[in-house]
Amino acid sequence: YVEMSPTKVFLIQLLNIAGLGPVFGPILGALYGPIALLWVVIGCVFAGAVHDYFSGMLSVRYNGKSVPDIVGYNLGDLIKKLMRVFAVVLLILVGVVFVAGPAGLLSQLTGMHSMLFVAIIFAYYFLATILPVDKIIGRIYPVFGCALLFMALGILAVLLFSGKYTIPEFTSLENCIADPERFPILPMLFTTIACGAISGFHATQSPLMARCLRSERQARPVFYGAMISESIIALIWAAIAMAFWNGASGLNAAIAEYGGQAAVMVDVIARTTLGEVLAGLVIFGVVACAITSGDTAFRSARLIVADFMGLEQRSLRKRIYISIPLFAAGLVIIFCLPFEAMWSYFAWMNQTLAMVTLWMLTAYLNKR
């Protein structure tokens, strides 16, 4: 429980929930055509922002409790016990996904072995997980949060004012992906674009910042505002992906050419539209976003475990005791599962948690 300024809390919340989601997800989701833009807008306004606001606000009302405990208060002890395990597994998967993604991108850019970057990122994650929130996260994350916003605004400026790109018009609900039978809109679009529309992972991050707010009045601009901001970022990247490759058909061809690697496509877009120097800053921003979501995922997992075990977290030794098994599990996953499998499990668990959170919010409001 470390009080911080509302602006700083907002920027940290935005960075915690964003990660690679509002960049990679919309680029891949744009394969489905302009309907992806519709999903981001409707999903965010009517589901995602509501989900994020209430999960954060209820954490404030329940004195900073984590999402499994809040679920337990409203849906019963059995669901709470299941959610404890479910949330911790999801958070470990998030942490691992956001190790493998940036490590692979850094390896591609530098030519150095990806395992070196995995080791460096894991070491940083461990420090950020066990240290108080104001020591690392509170100091550098607001800077990264500003970088994320400026990165998206730079792409938007090119999209609107360069005169080179035209955003495809929304004319039908047609599935524009290359293989529509294998990848139907329902449910694949809704797991491809999660961050920017609705993501259960956000419910695990909101309690981190709920413990840093000065009053309940700050909850709406922080939690609702951060989700709206993430949705705008997602819209920008989905729009530039479609405009850059002249529609969904061109984007499908580009995906095939680059082997489905969204990181490579971000690099191509950035270098072409912004130039080498600014493109380097964009890639740095993408890597930073992924890493800053990964470390707070492990931090959230530690807090959830500490809550249900009843362990106070003032002692550094106890924080280390809880963190070691979590990181050991993460290492096992990263060495035993390919990235595609990790991402598939994460995508399913992420939206399942979002469903449970909305169920819990409905029960809470129904009681009142």
Where are these regions (language model features)?
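Hydrophobic alpha-helical segments and their helix-loop junctions in multi-pass secondary transporters
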Residues: 95-120, 125-129, 148-177, 361-368
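Extracellular/periplasmic helix-exit of transmembrane alpha-helices
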Residues: 56, 159-170, 224-268
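Flexible loop linkers connecting adjacent transmembrane helices
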Residues: 1-4, 28-29, 34, 50-79, ...
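Membrane-interface "cap" regions at the ends of multi-pass membrane proteins
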Residues: 1-23, 188, 218
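Helix-loop-helix module between adjacent transmembrane segments
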Residues: 12-17, 46-63, 67-131, 194-198, ...
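Membrane-helix boundary/coupling elements in multi-pass transport proteins
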Residues: 20-27, 90-103, 191-213, 237, ...
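Loop-to-transmembrane helix boundary motifs in multi-pass membrane proteins
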Residues: 77-81, 115-119, 225-234, 242-248, ...
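Membrane-water interface regions at transmembrane-helix termini and the short interhelical loops
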Residues: 31, 58, 97-109, 122-144, ...
